[in-house]
Amino acid sequence: MAKKIVGFIKLQVPAGKANPSPPIGPALGQRGLNIMEFCKAFNAKTQGMEPGLPIPVVITAFADKSFTFIMKTPPATVLIKKASGVQKGSAKPHTDKVGTLTRAQAEEIAKTKQPDLTAADLDAAVRTIAGSARSMGITVEGV
C-alpha cells in the first residue's frame, strides 16, 4: 500500500547551500521532517551545479515523517540575468532596456529549461525564454 501524503512543500534553495536556517528549517520542522537529512541529500544532489544557483524543489511529506523531493531547473529569470550580465531587470521593461541576449544564449537557456517547459520543441522554448527576457527589459537579438 502507498504511503499517505500529508503535504507538499515548495522551496527555492541555493544549490549546495541547504542548511537548517530559514526558510528550510521552519518549513520542514512544522511537518516533523528530518531537516538535516534533507539538507545532506539536497547538497549531495546539487554538488555538480554552480554553488548558490537557486533550485526550486518540491518536497513530498508522508504521514510516517519520511519525505521525497523533486528538483526542478533553475528559474528562467536567474539564467537570463546571468547570461546577459545584468543584476536585475528593468523597472520599465518596454521603455528602458538594461541588457541584451543573443539567440545562442536563449537556446542554451531553453535547453536547460526544456524539462520544465510545456513547449513542444526547442524553437518554441527559445521563444518562451525570449518573451521572459523582453518582459525583464532585455533586448533579444535574432529571435
From Swiss-Prot:
HAMAP family according to UniProt: Ribosomal_uL11
Gene Ontology biological process terms in this record: translation
Gene Ontology terms for molecular function: large ribosomal subunit rRNA binding; structural constituent of ribosome
Quaternary structure and partners: Part of the ribosomal stalk of the 50S ribosomal subunit. Interacts with L10 and the large rRNA to form the base of the stalk. L10 forms an elongated spine to which L12 dimers bind in a sequential fashion forming a multimeric L10(L12)X complex.
InterPro entries: Ribosomal_uL11, Ribosomal_uL11_bac-typ, Ribosomal_uL11_C, Ribosomal_uL11_C_sf, Ribosomal_uL11_CS, Ribosomal_uL11_N, Ribosomal_uL11_N_sf
Protein name: Large ribosomal subunit protein uL11
Modification(s) after translation: One or more lysine residues are methylated.
Function according to Swiss-Prot or TrEMBL: Forms part of the ribosomal stalk which helps the ribosome interact with GTP-bound translation factors.
Keywords: Methylation, Ribonucleoprotein, Ribosomal protein, RNA-binding, rRNA-binding
Family the entry assigns: Belongs to the universal ribosomal protein uL11 family.
Keyword Ribonucleoprotein tagged: yes
Gene: rplK
Pfam family, one: Ribosomal_L11_N
Organism name: Bordetella parapertussis (strain 12822 / ATCC BAA-587 / NCTC 13253)
GO CC terms: cytosolic large ribosomal subunit
UniProt cross-references to CDD domains, sorted A to Z: Ribosomal_L11 (cd00349)
Protein origin, superkingdom: Bacteria
